[in-house]
Amino acid sequence: MMVAISAPGWKPCPVVISDWRRRPLAPWICRTFGPVTETALGHVQVIGGGPGGLTAAALLRQACPDVEVVVYERNSQRSTFGFGVVFSAATMRGLAAAAPQVHAELTARAVSWDTVELRLRGEVHRCGGNRMSAIARRDLLDVLESWAVDVGVVVNHSSSIEEIPPGAGLTVVASGANSIFRDRAAEQLEASYTEADARYIWCGTEARFDGLTFPFVSTDAGVFGAHAYPISEGLSTFIVECDEATWRAAGLDASDVSQSPGASDEYSLGVLADVFAESLGGRPLLGNSSRWGRFRTRRARRWVTGAVAFIGDAVHTAHFSVGSGTKMAMEDAIALAEAVRVCDSVPAALERFQHDRIHQVDRLQQLASTSLDWWEHFGVLHERLAPWQFAVNFFTRSVTVGDLEQRDPAFIEAARAVWRAGSGGHAVLDTPLATAAGTAIRRVGRFDGTVARMPGVELRDQPGVRIVRDSSAATRRRRAEQARFDGQVAVLVEPCRPSVDLDDLAETLVLSGRADLVAFEADGHLT
């Protein structure tokens, strides 16, 4: 479900927030930490008072009220950066189970939707069944801090911690993507990051959007795309992305280097407000330390060293097109508290937390990597694909046509209808592919790694034909797309996996414009 908090000056309602101890708690919170006694846990400290750190602190204190829990936050109480936070329905369900009163407080101020909208070249394409939630970051922090303080957590603002204080039974590091503690422990954690080539800038606007909306605009400099969603009655998040060439051609690189630390790039905000004037209704873009950056995907093979657990952006990030770092950090916090509950020692709890949560985050990062690759190259897709096919391509960045059909059958049927209208009434996988030999191909007979053989014809790498295989899925499919744009027949070779519906994947790749012909390879043979 979608959640949004509105009034900037809102304070949590006392009847909900102030009497946590007298209200029924979630079933697992009512129990103790099991064999991990309060004495063994001793003192808990959390470095970082963002949503992940506050959630961890409140859950640990609430479950074990005699344990001292202290949060150190470097910023003052009312300062925050950014605009809104997006949650999935699954995240909200997890929060409801862990902290039902907090969930209720947020939901009561919700802005909900499940339809995602694309705007490009004068057309609008919508796909439903995408349940999410969004909230103003300042309001989220107000709710979480009130909860934490009310259950007995000590929150110290304006506390810049340079060294981890000794003596705690458990330390939770939730100090964000620029964590100095992660950097110091990088070798033990096996921490690394990769940086994208494309540019993005995080803004706000008073323009109203009904739900998650993606406007795309072609300019003389190149194509700009935006992620927009409401976070309150009068405020929306507005994130703009473009490739490096577009950023430079628009002259946005010159303004970036002149900005002082912490300032917003007002020149870029003005340029982008003009670019997206139609979607913004002529309203300006608002800054809050809004600067151009390149997205960094952070990973770590370990999240624990000694009695220190790292959560959130300090050890993992995923591109915001598939999920927010805030929601991932809060999910980490819930998982950490649950691990402490069921394990017989702090070391065992930290190992369980690390093992279980790393696998969950790995899966999300794989999806995010594919989506990030799409956002690195969306400009050429915008210019070369018809709007309906661009929409299919966009919505199948990380899922298949079959997945979308379960969410919104009408969206997929509309795309198939356009396909049939342009292919003589053929369904996607029954559409013949004409060859120079005069043969109409519907199904590949055999693929031996270099040649796709059908009765009466062979397709191999040659002028006019491109067989694309190996490399990562995102790179492979992007190369096939480019081959099509260059006027070649793109034969996309995909690995055959038992869990994959081959017809569903083939239809996805063809209907989205990624390939003309799809072969599935298992030990060099079609399966």
Spans of model-derived segments:
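C-terminal helical "tail/cap" subdomain of flavin- and related membrane-associated enzymes
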Residues: 25-28, 34-40, 338-464
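Conserved FAD/dinucleotide-binding core of flavoprotein oxidoreductases
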Residues: 127-130, 212-294
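Conserved Rossmann-like nucleotide-cofactor binding loop
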Residues: 52, 77, 178
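Conserved N-terminal glycine-rich FAD pyrophosphate-binding loop of Rossmann-like flavoproteins
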Residues: 76-94
